[in-house]
Amino acid sequence: MSIETSEATVKIAPRLKTRYADEIKKTLQDDFSYVNVNQVPRLVKVVVNMGVGEAARDSKVIDGAVRDLTLITGQKPMVTKARKSIAQFKLREGMPIGAHTTLRGDRMWEFVDRLVTLALPRIRDFRGLSGKQFDGNGNYTFGLTEQVMFHEIDQDAIDKIRGMDITVVTTAKTDDEGRALLKALGFPFKSED
């Protein structure tokens, strides 16, 4: 029994993943003088979260957020439900209040590549990402005010402008290591004055 491989089954590694393995890993190992190659920080996952507070009043609003996140990330998001009831917000336990997607592996690398090279430069008056949003363990979280900057979103079909939070989780132990990794991957940080 022989296994046939066709052109369609050949898997191409994402270009940012290849660049990380070939160049960035070696540079970071030299910069931080790691003894073992496994000490070099790497990306673990990217979480894209879209909070939709209006979904408490109108349950159809969540469908637009799910559709947008599916187009942006390439996978179906999980609907986030309220954990407890809050009377002031007219919110009951179990109501949908957002959607989130966790990207790992090749999808994560492709998303980060598209985010850095295509989406972020399309933001109006964009001067770079703040370098102060690291959590102390090398993970970075930032927010986007609208979904329009992604090429996958048809600008004429937008029913509502929605923002999102993007968290990049790394194996870095300190913020400096995380910042060096993300800068090498192409994240445009503001210069600290």
From Swiss-Prot:
Q: Pfam families of this UniProt entry?
A: Ribosomal_L5, Ribosomal_L5_C
Q: Where are the transmembrane segments?
A: none
**A Gene Ontology MF term for this entry?**
tRNA binding
Under Gene3D superfamilies, the record lists: 3.30.1440.10
Cellular component GO terms, alphabetical: ribonucleoprotein complex; ribosome
Q: Which family does it belong to?
A: Belongs to the universal ribosomal protein uL5 family.
Its biological purpose is as follows:
This is one of the proteins that bind and probably mediate the attachment of the 5S RNA into the large ribosomal subunit, where it forms part of the central protuberance. In the 70S ribosome it contacts protein S13 of the 30S subunit (bridge B1b), connecting the 2 subunits; this bridge is implicated in subunit movement. Contacts the P site tRNA; the 5S rRNA and some of its associated proteins might help stabilize positioning of ribosome-bound tRNAs.
Listed HAMAP family: Ribosomal_uL5_B (MF_01333_B)
Q: Which PANTHER family match?
A: 60S RIBOSOMAL PROTEIN L11-RELATED (PTHR11994)
Assembly: Part of the 50S ribosomal subunit; part of the 5S rRNA/L5/L18/L25 subcomplex. Contacts the 5S rRNA and the P site tRNA. Forms a bridge to the 30S subunit in the 70S ribosome.
Report what the protein is called: Large ribosomal subunit protein uL5
What is the scientific name of the source organism? Renibacterium salmoninarum (strain ATCC 33209 / DSM 20767 / JCM 11484 / NBRC 15589 / NCIMB 2235)
Organismal lineage: Bacteria, Bacillati, Actinomycetota, Actinomycetes, Micrococcales
What is the name of the gene encoding this protein? Answer: rplE
